[in-house]
Structure formats: C-alpha cells, structure tokens
C-alpha cells in the first residue's frame, strides 16, 4: 500500500466519526463506575451499598438480548425520520443527556433507591447506544480500515473516562453536585452533534423484515457463512485469545501489594504507566493493521501480549523498584492496547453488516466470559 493511500486511510472522515463514537460510548459508563461511586461516598453512603451498585452494569453484559430490535426497528421521532441506526443513536443520546443531569438533583441518603433505578436506566441506555454505535461503525468502515477505526474508537472510549473520572471530580470540590452532573451530561452533546451531522449508512445487505428474522437470521448467517466447524473454531478463538492476558492482570493490584509497593506507589505509577501505553499501543496497532492486515496482526500482537506477561515474573524475581514497576505495567498495557486493537477488528470483520447490531453484541458478550472466569479463578490457580 502506498503512502498516499495510507494517509487517506488515516486522515478521513470515517476516522473522525470513530473518535466521536468512542467518546460517546465511554462517557456514560465512566459516569457510572467513576463519578457516581465518588458522589455517593462523599454524601455519606456506606461502602456496602456502593458495592451493590456494581450490579447496575448488568445491561452491558446482557445487551445482546435486545440487540435484534436494533437491527429490525427504527424509532420514529415525530416528523423526523433519521433512519434505522441514527434513530436509535439520537433517542439514546437525548435520554442519556437528561438522565445523567437528573442524578445530581437527588439526595443519596433519602433517594438511594431512586438513584439506583436511574443508574440502571442509564446503563441500559448506554448499552443500547453501544450496540448501535458498534453497528454503525461496522457499516461505514471498509474491511481494511476496521483495525484503525476500531482502535481509534476504543482509545477515544478510554479517554472519555477522563471527563467523569477527573474533570468532574475536580469540579465537585468547587461546585454543588447538581451543577457537576449537568456539566458532565453536557459532554453527551458531542454524541448528539455527531448523530445530527452524519448520514444513515447505506447497506448492501437486506435488513431483517420481521423480529423473528432479526433473532434467527444472525445465527443462521454466521454458521452458513463460516460453516459449522469453522464457526465453532472462531468462537473458541474469541474465548481464548485474551484469556492469558485476563488471568495475568486479574490479581495485579494484590500482587503489587505483596511485592511491597505502597498503595500510593501503585496509584501514581499504575495510573500513568497503564493508560498512555495502552492508547499508544492501540493507535500503533491500528496503523500497523493497515499495512499487515488483521490476521497477521493477531499473531504478532498476540506474541507481544505473551512476552509482556513475562514482565510479572521478572518483577517477582527482582523485587521492589518503582522504575521496574512502571516498566512492567507500561509494557503489559502496550501489549493490551495492541492485542485489543487486533481483536476488536477481528470481531468486527466477523460480523455481517446486515446483522451488525446483534452479532457484534453477541460476540462482545462472549469475549467477556473468560475475563469474568479469570477474575474468579486466578486466585484459586495460584494456591
């Protein structure tokens, strides 16, 4: 591929759209996992109750259950007909704008259940927005741009966490919480601007015409395109590709503590040594995939993941040293960024654009299984 074509693949409108889709996806999630717990604790809510709030994340796991609706039905908005994908984007973003702003007007001590239900609603809307943004991205990106486009999306998703996780927390020291949540919800407007400024993707494939077809056809399409044996091999690959990485990082913080590092050391070093190498790895991986393709990237980046995990063994052998902790974490998350870039691109390529909402949601739910199992069983394996 010549350099002009490479520049065109990097510097185009589709990549700009991927920045906005990533930011729009990440914002609501980080409101729930970063800002809401800090708000509740500041207002005097107990750790037990705050811990139970993690259950509001269930819609992200089970989003595949209603994903066929997004492949079948569009939402009419009075006289405005934005189309199948954009109607869901616009509806979820408008509701997210309102519901996130509403949080700050409730008292955590006297309205905790109302807050819990409202947060569950935000999680449902956010998961639904994720479904449609994944589908939209799959439809607008040609296969050769899936790697870079999805890398940009994932990194913008992570950077979005700096708004509720950093900016909003800083503002809360100077402003009342109701203003903080209104300001935070204002960042949802970036997603709305995106939705209003883009066009509905053109589809070369026939969309399902009945709800039954929207549920059954994605499965039939996947197994008929790949063949039963190949389909099961692909699903097994999706389950296993990130398993080692998940197991290596599942108990990382307890491991650092056992090695003698203080919580301050871990907080300062881990935060800075993880985020930016992961972002650099994701962007570099996306650009490399334009040159080498997704299949070769899976092998190459997978090897980097394996080597980076060995850093934990080096840390265990050599022992304490902040420079070593930063080096090990940085290299590990560089591998995470590279591997995630290739893996998400592979998942996107495996989907059929006609059933992108359902298949993408199913595949991403499947890939969450080994991460959950790793978190639960890694400690047992070390006994």
Regions picked out by a protein language model, each given a short descriptive name:
Residues 87-109, 303-320:
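C-terminal ends and interior cores of transmembrane alpha-helices
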